[in-house]
């Protein structure tokens, strides 16, 4: 595969999953849903780019002598700003729908409501607190480990979202997920392999095989738990659920690394 094609696909993934102003090619529609079959493998690469920006802020803030907690907050804030809180919005909508709806149709209706409810607010708070706390804990052990873990988590968690979109059919016919379509089994597997490979290359040298297996294993558990829950409650997936999967898998990955990185 040519480098220009890879860069174009990563650019398409960044345009869709972030606020980074990546220009579209002459033959591309910058406002159309991406071709997931084509760019699925590039989604974890785009995630790594977003994580890299957060990691740079993390290392920079730590090098300036700021407290670990402040550095962790700035790193998470950077990732949130770069994505326009896309995944956080999905997590909040999913929590509101799954927690507040008594029927499939009511859950989907709540998930489309732009207002945030108590379940969504709690989910957002816990997501932000957990990511900040986990990065703070990793920073206390090693800034390098913390930075690499953030990049790997941002990459693998977005590959998990691709797997969800393939595992389940769209829950509604007129949502963003239905418009983008399913990536297809081959494309979803390629996305997962790229995410897992990046995570392995980043975490094994810095923290070890055990940390890598634990982090990936917890991410897989989070993915399958959300897949089963989404299928049971709404009969499929939506873009919001994919965002929730990204958030939960990122938390699970960071937690797995910290479990093995801390002194025993």
Swiss-Prot record:
Query: What Gene Ontology molecular-function terms does this entry list?
Result: adenosylcobinamide-GDP ribazoletransferase activity; cobalamin 5'-phosphate synthase activity
The pathway that the record names for this protein is:
Cofactor biosynthesis; adenosylcobalamin biosynthesis; adenosylcobalamin from cob(II)yrinate a,c-diamide: step 7/7
* Subcellular location per the Swiss-Prot or TrEMBL entry: Cell inner membrane
Can you tell me where the transmembrane regions are?
39-59, 63-83, 121-141, 148-168, 201-221, 241-261
EC annotation from Swiss-Prot or TrEMBL = 2.7.8.26
Report the catalytic activity: alpha-ribazole + adenosylcob(III)inamide-GDP = adenosylcob(III)alamin + GMP + H(+); alpha-ribazole 5'-phosphate + adenosylcob(III)inamide-GDP = adenosylcob(III)alamin 5'-phosphate + GMP + H(+)
Could you tell me what this protein does? Answer: Joins adenosylcobinamide-GDP and alpha-ribazole to generate adenosylcobalamin (Ado-cobalamin). Also synthesizes adenosylcobalamin 5'-phosphate from adenosylcobinamide-GDP and alpha-ribazole 5'-phosphate.
Protein name in UniProt: Adenosylcobinamide-GDP ribazoletransferase
């Amino acid at each position: 595969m040519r480098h220009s094609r890879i860069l174009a696909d990563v650019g398409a993934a960044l345009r869709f999953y972030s606020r980074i102003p990546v220009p579209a090619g002459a033959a591309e529609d910058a406002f159309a849903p991406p071709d997931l079959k084509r760019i699925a493998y590039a989604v974890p690469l785009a995630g790594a780019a977003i994580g890299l920006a957060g990691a740079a802020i993390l290392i920079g803030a730590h090098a300036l002598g700021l407290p670990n907690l402040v550095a962790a907050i700035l790193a998470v804030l950077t990732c949130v700003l770069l994505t326009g809180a896309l995944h956080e919005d999905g997590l909040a909508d999913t929590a509101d729908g799954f927690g507040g709806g008594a029927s499939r149709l009511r859950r989907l209706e709540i998930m489309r409501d732009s207002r945030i409810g108590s379940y969504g607010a709690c989910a957002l708070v816990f997501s932000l607190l957990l990511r900040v706390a986990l990065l703070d804990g990793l920073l206390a052990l090693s800034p390098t480990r913390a930075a690499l873990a953030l990049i790997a988590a941002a990459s693998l968690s977005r590959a998990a979202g691709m797997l969800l979109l393939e595992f389940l059919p769209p829950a509604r016919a007129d949502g963003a997920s239905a418009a983008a379509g399913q990536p297809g089994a081959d494309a979803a597997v390629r996305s997962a392999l790229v995410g897992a490979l990046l995570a392995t290359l980043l975490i094994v040298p810095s923290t070890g095989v055990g940390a890598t297996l634990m982090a990936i294993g917890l991410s897989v558990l989070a993915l399958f738990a959300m897949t089963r829950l989404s299928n049971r409650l709404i009969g499929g997936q939506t873009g919001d659920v994919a965002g929730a999967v990204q958030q939960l898998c990122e938390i699970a990955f960071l937690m797995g690394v910290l479990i093995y990185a801390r002194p025993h």
